Every structure is written in structure tokens, then in C-alpha cells.
């Protein structure tokens, strides 16, 4: 099969299986309301949990830095792309989360891939939750290590996988808050087990940082757990983009010396780092926004009892409505759009087969009226 035939075959199969994705150009987005093709929708698909995307101080910080330092970083961090602004942000992140070092990355996907592909050598063992993000699964299976997936949020399964495995250094990986189900990992038990077996524990807290824990320090702080490696991202609660890895001095130096993702990638723009530094300040003083988000979560849970048979057990901003069938999920998503509500349909391979869903994400800017309209619309359109 030549290139064109293979590509066309795969695309046609994607369409046939109702997995085809359509990229939509958003005209205006203030986080609560988005405009697409001249239509206005209440947005329940944004990861900007605290509504900082349009924060005036953060926007001004980006403008100021772009004027002062220019737009591009001009090189990798190991050439000339690393500035005193990057250094300052890394130091502030490390101090905030009580780690010796922080390393900036251009995305969470890159950060996770860099850690796993750089650390893992032949016969090392990787133990990861079955519902781990693609940025964890893909580099793990592409590494020279041995991969084991334990039952979702099941420490007993993790332990069984470990004791029935053979190999060298164990790396345990989990998310703090899972991106598609919104549930929280049993971090305390997993952390204790990792220490017992002298392994490394890596936690991806993309959806917890800024939202959970004291001062927004994330789900690990909330559960009094300090993993050996912590990945945080700036595209969710921080309202920007990018990521950072928090770790020991030794691991940080190892990544700097051996990670191709750091060596051969252009560094984050200085203006972006400057804006993230301002966003960090806002996060540290965002208790009011976190309380408002929690109020919205509580309001949704209290008023969505009519949908309880469709909901997963989540107490976070991520509230999945499980439909199962790909086509039914897409139809419901389109029907909600006709009611002025934007909720994306999430289908395999992002989620397991037969678990297609509407992934509702609540934020601090939603009103009670927004949430009531969402619940009422889903109930009327999909009363099963």
C-alpha cells in the first residue's frame, strides 16, 4: 500500500468509526463565553479553571516583556535561549513547591516525554496507571524499559504488578487529577509504596496545580505527598501554556545533560516566562477564585442528581458525562450547541473504547445560571 492509499484508508476508517476530529477556529474567547462562526456559546470545555487567561496583569506582563526583551528566545536553553527571566521563574517555582530545582519546558507533553525517555534505560521498570495521559504512555512504550499498567487508581494492582515483575529500577507514574475522569489518585498509598521499594515516583499534576491544595500548590500538597518528580503545566489554571518539572538537583542536572528535548528545542519565549511569573503571583493570591470554583463544583454536583447514572465519581472541575457510543456522543454535543452550550465530545483513542463522553469542565467564571442551563439541557436531550 503506497503512502496516499494508506493515508486515505486510515482517514476513511476514522470517519467510518465516528472518530474523525474537526478543528474549530474560535473567534473570541473570554473563557466563560466563546464565539464560533458568529455564534455565541457558554464554554464548558476550557481548562482555564480560574479564568486567568484574560487577567489584565498577566496580559500586561506579556506585553511589557515582549517590548523589553523581544519575541523569540533565539536558541535552546543550553545555547543563548536561557535568560535571567527563565532563571527567576524556575527559582520562584522551586521555592513555591519546595523543590531544589525546576526546569521549564515548552509543553506538558514535552516535559513528560523528556523525563521518561531520558531516565529510562534497558530493563528499568515503568509502572503506570491504565488511564495515564498519552504523554506518559507513548514515551514509556517507546523506551527500552519494561512497561506495566496497573488498574486505574488501584494500589493493590500496582503492588501485584511490581511483585510479579522482574527488572531494574522502578519508576511509578500517575496523574494527580485525571484529565478525562476528574478523579484523584490515591497518592498517599502510592507514595508510601514507592518509598518502600526504593523507586522513583512521578506525578503529573497538570489539572491539580493552581486549583487544589494550600495556596494552589496542587493535589500532591493536598495529600501531603512529595513525589520525586512533579510535572506541572501552565495551560490550565495558569491560563497560558508551557510546563515545568520539579525535582532534585541530581535529576535536574541529569536532564540538562542528557535530555534531547532540552538540548535541541528552542527555549520558551522570554515574554511567556515573564507572563507565567506574573500568573504565579496571581495563583498564589487566588483563594477567592478557588473558592468560587469549588462553589460551582458543589452546585453542579448538588443539582445534577438527575444525571447521576451518567456521571463519574468526580469532585473536581472535570465532570464527564459517559455516553458510550461515539455517534450518540457527537449528536448530543451538537444538540447542546444548538442550545448555546459548548461541550466537546471526547472519543477513543483519547478515552477507552465504548466510553465516549461529554467532558464538562467548570471554572470560576461560570454562573449558577450557566450551570443550571447546562444540566437542564442535558437532561432534556438525553433522559435515559
Swiss-Prot record:
A GO BP entry: biotin biosynthetic process
Residues where pyridoxal 5'-phosphate binds: 108-109, 179, 207, 233
InterPro entries reported in the protein's UniProt record: Aminotrans_II_pyridoxalP_BS (IPR001917), Aminotransferase_I/II_large (IPR004839), AON_synthase_class-II (IPR050087), AONS_Proteobacteria (IPR022834), PyrdxlP-dep_Trfase (IPR015424), PyrdxlP-dep_Trfase_major (IPR015421), PyrdxlP-dep_Trfase_small (IPR015422)
SUPFAM superfamilies associated with the record: PLP-dependent transferases
EC number: 2.3.1.47
Function comment: Catalyzes the decarboxylative condensation of pimeloyl-[acyl-carrier protein] and L-alanine to produce 8-amino-7-oxononanoate (AON), [acyl-carrier protein], and carbon dioxide.
Similarity-based family: Belongs to the class-II pyridoxal-phosphate-dependent aminotransferase family. BioF subfamily.
Record's protein name: 8-amino-7-oxononanoate synthase
Species of the source: Buchnera aphidicola subsp. Baizongia pistaciae (strain Bp)
Chain's gene name: bioF
